[in-house]
Amino acid sequence: MKINKKIFDNGLRLVHNEDTSTQMVALNIVYDVGARDEHPEHTGFAHLFEHLMFGGSVHIPDYDAPLQLAGGENNAWTNNDITNYYLTVPKSNVEIGFWLESDRMLELAFSEQSLEVQRAVVMEEFKQRCLNQPYGDVGHLLRPLAYQTHPYRWPTIGKDLSHIANATLDEVKEFFFRFYAPNNAVLAVTGNISWEETIRLTEKWFAPIPRRNVPVRQLPQEVVQTAERRQT
């Protein structure tokens, strides 16, 4: 398997593999931000933002509509370390994928309405997964036993439901401009697309996006466990 790599002037890292056995192309953008980058009293933001990224950008109010018309599909997931967005699209419509992903990296549309809609979705997910099923709170109970100082001590969905309920639009914007930047992302492209075409489309859609001042990660050092920890 041949892997091609390139780093653009704005810091975006591109990884490519060509596979001519398929008529599809997959784009995957990984942002180097996860639950570990949250404030202890404002947890769940990385996961909330995963949902907000599908609320539309400045030039594309409905993210899903053009992708569906092009025969594509998409999804995303978040963990403690990264946030991952991916889509697949027929090779004949591949530029739509570059257009969609670059536009929301550059100018996500922020609105109280979008925040309220996605907040409600995330809060319902929290209730369904953590509050309304047997042993749903196991992660919330065990993580603080395993980690007492490191931010791995809270789950990706958030430490407390109130953290999402009280999230403000200004806090959401601040989170975006801190972490969602070309110099904090890896774009992986695979499928029936050449390296030359991948470079051309990345230059066209992503290269003009300016760098942002991504903070240097300074996570607290977890202390060495020297005794048994038990939850009763």
Summary of predicted features, one role per range:
Residues 1-35, 59-93, 129-184, 204, ...:
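Non-catalytic beta-strand/loop surface segments
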Residues 33-43:
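Short pre-active-site segment immediately N-terminal to the catalytic Zn-binding motif
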Residues 44-57:
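Active-site SXXK
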Residues 56, 88-121:
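M16/insulysin-pitrilysin zinc metalloprotease superfamily fold
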Residues 99-104, 199-206:
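Short amphipathic alpha-helices in soluble, non-transmembrane regions
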Residues 192:
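Carbohydrate-associated surface elements
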